[in-house]
Amino acid sequence: MTLLNAPAYDEQKENRKHNILLGSGIFLAAMVVLTLAGYLLGHGWLFTNLPAEHRMKVFLTTVQAQDYPKAYGIYYNDPQWQQHPDRYKDYPLQRFIEDFTTESDWKGQVTSFHVDFSRRNKTGVVVAATINGTTNLTLMICNSDGTLAAYPYVLTRGF
């Protein structure tokens, strides 16, 4: 094929190529924005930590409603924990209730809370919440078994 007998211009093919390039650019820009927004807002890349934050919210809502047996089941990721309480004899329900009421850092019932942000590490997702407007609570949701665990460090926003 020489320059003098070039193929005819196909407008439909060119429009399709243009639309694919434009759509790919828009998709790429949206992914970059979502990725950075999730990270900067403290919810993980592409908001991947939102399920863990939701779990923490369900747990704290249950504690706020003073349904401690249900909260204990959420804490251990075992809704049927009452059928085998001997598995949890190292941290019994009574101690759990004390830890989330009188012996807690906020010294009483949970009256309000806000799940602030989260960070992912090798073993799970660490979620920070504010209890009763002033006190920080940091729990880790373990990847291995889905249980909640006390996290010894204060989680702060930042890079």
Residues covered by each model-derived region:
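Short beta-strand edge/turn micro-motifs at domain boundaries
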Residues: 2, 12-14, 21, 130-159
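Short, structured coil/loop segments at alpha-helix boundaries
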Residues: 18, 51-56, 74-77, 146-149
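Short solvent-exposed beta->alpha transition segments
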Residues: 54, 58, 69-126, 130-131
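Short, flexible coil/linker elements and helix-boundary hinge sites characteristic
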Residues: 42-44, 84, 101, 133, ...
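Short, low-complexity N-terminal intrinsically disordered segments enriched in polar/charged residues
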Residues: 5-61, 65
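Hydrophobic, Leu/Ile/Phe/Ala-enriched alpha-helical segments that form helix-helix packing faces
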Residues: 63, 100, 104, 147-150
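Contiguous hydrophobic segments
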Residues: 2-12, 18-23, 92-107
